[in-house]
């Protein structure tokens, strides 16, 4: 369903290598014409050194012989790779030394490690540039494991002020994502975020751009790492600089934040967060909306249960065709039904099972079994009267203390949103090309 596909918007903020998995996914889903997707892959590959991959794509796209320019490029890439391997081999051998490995694991100070290598192995400053160039070349060739290894060596040796320090962090994160090493990718994501947040050299606009890129790159990690759906809420909703970036540069990210909230396994946290999420969705509804955000609006703003049920059916189509969200489908539908049920029950103290079945798009028998399971698993304070076919809700009285906490949180959040809106109006809105790590000489500027 191309209408709700965000691939083009998201790709604008990604390194070209990170776009390939998205195109492969679209190819399987058959949302777009296959030849258009192949041409898109070929265009992306033109600025990489993955020549063999480009040749395979060209063969699938065209029946004629592979262009001479591609064959020449392959010869050039192989020659460059051999030259860089020869230059880097002595450096790599230093890191293979067991004592060097021990020093790297025990020493947190890059300067001390550099001095140790200089004293024991004759390591020189220019070796860092050689190591960085080789790591980047490996990445351009699609050897992400090699790139990650050499970028790790580079990172532990260079100071934060090095001209390639920030660029190497982007490269390391991309490499781990493309190898699907989610624990390592989460560590790299955290390290990169800290670097961006503590960077006093970048202008406010540059920091905004960096955070926007980080938001998009983080989707790979957050929707694959076990703790991802908690972390995405904390980062996107409760860290003002990142919520501001979403509202200013990429409101389409609300789809992913909303899905993370709805599918979060912590029931208590999910209910608390929903109130804050609804406010953001309402505020940004004029800039972005899709069935997922509209489902929340229907249910929690308009209390339109028929509309919510209709949007839930549309959500299934959106989730199935979204690269990042396809694995969330089952959790989303289950929790969305629970939300409809809970909201409906807050309005009606006693509800017939038949009416509930209609609202949840189930048969009465399915609805009864579903409610029994909710009560059994302590997710619902209610009693079921099977003879009358009624569900009677329990009385969940909220203490005055809890009411004060909720009102204080609400005021704090509203103040935060007001401050962000003022900042948004004052800031000059600007967009930039995504950080294409593999094709930059140094950094992204």
Swiss-Prot record:
Component of the eukaryotic translation initiation factor 3 (eIF-3) complex, which is involved in protein synthesis of a specialized repertoire of mRNAs and, together with other initiation factors, stimulates binding of mRNA and methionyl-tRNAi to the 40S ribosome. The eIF-3 complex specifically targets and initiates translation of a subset of mRNAs involved in cell proliferation. One of its GO terms (molecular function) is translation initiation factor activity. The keyword tRNA-binding does not apply. Belongs to the eIF-3 subunit E family. This is Eukaryotic translation initiation factor 3 subunit E. SMART domains: eIF3_N (SM01186), PINT (SM00088). GO terms for biological process: formation of cytoplasmic translation initiation complex; translational initiation. The lineage of its organism: Eukaryota, Metazoa, Chordata, Craniata, Vertebrata. CDD domains: eIF3E.
């Amino acid at each position: 369903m191309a209408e709700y596909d965000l691939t083009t918007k998201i790709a604008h903020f990604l390194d070209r290598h990170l776009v390939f998995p998205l195109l492969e996914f679209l190819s399987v889903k058959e949302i777009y014409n296959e030849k258009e997707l192949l041409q898109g892959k070929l265009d992306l590959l033109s600025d990489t050194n993955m020549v063999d991959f480009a040749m395979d794509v060209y063969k699938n796209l065209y029946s004629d012989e592979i262009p001479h320019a591609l064959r020449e490029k392959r010869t050039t890439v192989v020659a460059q790779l051999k030259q860089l391997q020869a230059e880097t081999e002595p450096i790599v051998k230093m890191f293979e030394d067991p004592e060097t490995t021990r020093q790297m694991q025990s020493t947190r100070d890059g300067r001390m490690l550099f001095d140790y290598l200089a004293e024991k192995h004759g390591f020189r400053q220019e070796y860092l540039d050689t190591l960085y160039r080789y790591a980047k070349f490996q990445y351009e060739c699609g050897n992400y494991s090699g790139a990650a290894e050499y970028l790790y060596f580079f990172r532990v040796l260079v100071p934060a002020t090095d001209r390639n320090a920030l660029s190497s962090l982007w490269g390391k994160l991309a490499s781990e994502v493309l190898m699907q090493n989610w624990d390592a990718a989460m560590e790299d994501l955290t390290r990169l975020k800290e670097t961006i947040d503590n960077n006093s050299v970048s202008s406010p606009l540059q920091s905004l751009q960096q955070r926007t890129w980080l938001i998009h790159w983080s989707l790979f990690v957050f929707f694959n790492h076990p703790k991802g759906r908690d972390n995405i809420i904390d980062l996107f909703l409760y860290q003002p600089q990142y919520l501001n970036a979403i509202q200013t540069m990429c409101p389409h990210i609300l789809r992913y934040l909303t899905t993370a909230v709805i599918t979060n396994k912590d029931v208590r946290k999910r209910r608390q967060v929903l109130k804050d999420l609804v406010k953001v969705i309402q505020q940004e509804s004029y800039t972005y909306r899709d069935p997922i955000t509209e489902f929340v609006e229907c249910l929690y703003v308009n209390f339109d249960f028929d509309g919510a049920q209709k949007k839930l059916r549309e959500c299934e189509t959106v989730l199935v065709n979204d690269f990042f969200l396809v694995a969330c489908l089952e959790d989303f539908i289950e929790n969305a039904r629970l939300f409809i049920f809970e909201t409906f029950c807050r309005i009606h103290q006693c509800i017939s099972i038949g009416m509930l079945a209609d609202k949840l798009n189930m048969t009465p028998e399915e609805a009864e079994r579903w409610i029994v399971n909710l009560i059994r698993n302590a997710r619902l304070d209610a009693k079921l009267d099977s003879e009358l076919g009624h569900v009677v809700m329990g009385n969940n009285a909220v203490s005055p203390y809890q009411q004060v906490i909720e009102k204080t949180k609400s005021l704090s959040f509203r103040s935060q949103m007001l401050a962000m809106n003022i900042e948004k109006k004052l800031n000059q809105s600007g967009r930039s090309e995504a950080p294409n790590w593999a094709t930059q000489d140094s950094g992204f500027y």
